């Protein structure tokens, strides 16, 4: 296993959601620096009590859901990367030759926004809290894109938020992940290293396991009560002409194996499907195409993954992190 540096919670910027919502110029500058230099930052939610209350409510709902028998959960399997249930061990994991070891449940933003009737029962039964939470986080991330656009001097159709028009289809979704308790890693482990496919990811978890790759090696990203972890994805990196950093990360047990059930809530903001940008090879691709290719690559074997740069978004070469310098 790779050497992992000690916790680095003090090394990542902590930004105030309240100050960003208030369009504070200094906080917006710090936001740009964090997204360009680290690709990760902590977002202080402690002034937003309802958001934290809703998170705790959703966490309890999803714990009960994941505890249901597998055959019951498989009724929500849509064979989709944005909707429904997915069992453990469907993609390549952290250890060579072994699969991942997490299960997930996804709720599509398209479905919530359009109030479709085919929502899974657990969502339909608790629609008020799912709807309120997703819409608030969605608006927070669009606001963050707006602050980045403003600080970088981007105007009109060149603004980042213009690629996320409300009525257009998108791969955006709310995802819940459970890393089950294990006695051994022989059946799989963790979540393989990757960059996120979209624009911004909003993470909430009270448990350790998330790591990001730096020029010095792998570092823990410590959970902080009352804070979300936000990170830049490939699409935002490409839309920013590679000024902003989509950083490689993974999830691993803190010890030799997963000693307790670990839960994560993630909101993945992604551009509208037909948004176009230049990928790591300078080719014009749509956001939908990049998303689908990347998720197909998640399911490929480790040997196949080594022959393509898409999983790491072009941010790794010969297992070394590629660092891009940013001047404010």
Swiss-Prot record:
According to the UniProt entry, its GO molecular function terms are: dioxygenase activity; metal ion binding
Q: What is this protein called?
A: 2-oxoglutarate-dependent dioxygenase gloE
Q: Does the keyword Metal-binding apply?
A: yes
Enzyme class, spelled out: oxidoreductase
Recite the lineage of the species. Answer: Eukaryota, Fungi, Dikarya, Ascomycota, Pezizomycotina
The metabolic or biological pathway listed in the UniProt record of this protein is: Mycotoxin biosynthesis
Q: Which family does it belong to?
A: Belongs to the iron/ascorbate-dependent oxidoreductase family.
Instruction: Look up the EC number in the record and give it.
Output: 1.14.-.-
Q: Which PROSITE patterns match?
A: FE2OG_OXY
Which residues are involved in binding Fe cation? 194, 196, 249
- All copies of domain Fe2OG dioxygenase, residue ranges: 170-271
Which organism encodes this protein? Glarea lozoyensis (strain ATCC 20868 / MF5171)
